[in-house]
Amino acid sequence: MGAKPEGKKTPLTPSRAALDAIAVTLLCIFLLPLLASYASVTATLAVTHNAFVLWPYLLHPWHPSAGPHDRDQAIEAFWVSAWMFYNLVVIPGGLAVFILITFLPLVFLGSLGPLATLLHRVWLTTAASYCVWAYLIDDSVNRGGVASPTLRRLGLWSRIASYFDMKILVEGEEGEGEEGPRGGHGSRIFCYHPHGIIFWGVIAGFASWHWKEVRLQSRTLQSCDVRLGTISFNNLVPVFREVNKNIGSFTVSWNSCLRALERGLNILIIPGGARESMDAFPGTMNVRIRSRRGFVRLALARGASLVPVLSFGESDMYNLLKMKPGSLAFRVQRVYQSLFGFTVPLFWGKTLWGMPTIMPLRRPIRVVIGKPIQVVST
């Protein structure tokens, strides 16, 4: 028997469409604060839990029961949770304090004492000077970042890489006389797939000194430093932008990428973007590339080589709630993506103290760097 033809979808009535729009709006308003609270609370829980686990090893480093393997695992887990705590608690909290200290005294300006008024004026001058420098003068986040060697050498990064048993494999390194990813002599665009939930492979592999070690051991990547493209939101938060730009991060816009390539820099982008995180189900590698052609046009504009990068295990860090396309939750995610440039997938990692948290599962990551695809400038 032949398959029955699918029926046409019934169009929504005006009243149903209005109710649907109201539901999406309410979810957009309330879901993001709820998810942000969940992320902050569970990040705090994770760093507290890992600190308690690590503490006995610090007190009794030579105790027979404190083996080096267990001690290293405890340190690695602590630094992973500390990095998440910094991003999800310290940065938002610091931004809130920055805003309160700047604007709240203006409400009580008449009742402030002379010393408080003086201190507030000093703070306003300092904050205004920083904002002028950061957002009007300093343009490094729009032309490839800075990449401070000191920041990249921090032991934090090597511990995060060890937590995921991070390994970067370069195609062609095992062969004799092969060109490998060196390709031509121009700039390269490293195209990283998949995005995953938090792209731990990029953080552990390319934003750290781990990438320098890979280059030193490679025949084909010794002179190939990489700058990391990220959404503009990450370069707007005061102070946080300084950390970002000094690990080689820059705003991944068309003009910023062009300027970075014009400086002769190699850049890493994630063509699938935040939309790819919606498909980061464990045990899968869902890549969105057919509809993403901007990176190809970018390579054509500058004559840069395209270097494919695949991260195996990137989607295994978290459990992800599957959302049906067209559902309210799915549409809310699309609204967030259009407004902020990122999505807020419903996910969870390790369960600590009976609560699912944002702490990633300890899963191995293997990043494979392929040979470059030569592109002729048009």
Task: Identify what each model region corresponds to.
Residues 2-29, 259-378:
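Non-catalytic C-terminal accessory region of glycerolipid acyltransferases
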Residues 4-6, 51-72, 141-151:
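Interhelical loop segments of eukaryotic multi-pass membrane proteins
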Residues 9-59, 70-133:
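Alpha-helical bilayer-embedded segments of polytopic membrane proteins, i.e.
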Residues 45-65, 166-167, 339-350, 354-356:
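Low-complexity, charge- and small-residue-enriched intrinsically disordered regions
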Residues 125-155, 182-263, 273-291, 331:
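Catalytic core of membrane glycerolipid acyltransferases/transacylases, capturing the structured
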Residues 156-186, 251:
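A short, well-structured juxtamembrane/interface segment
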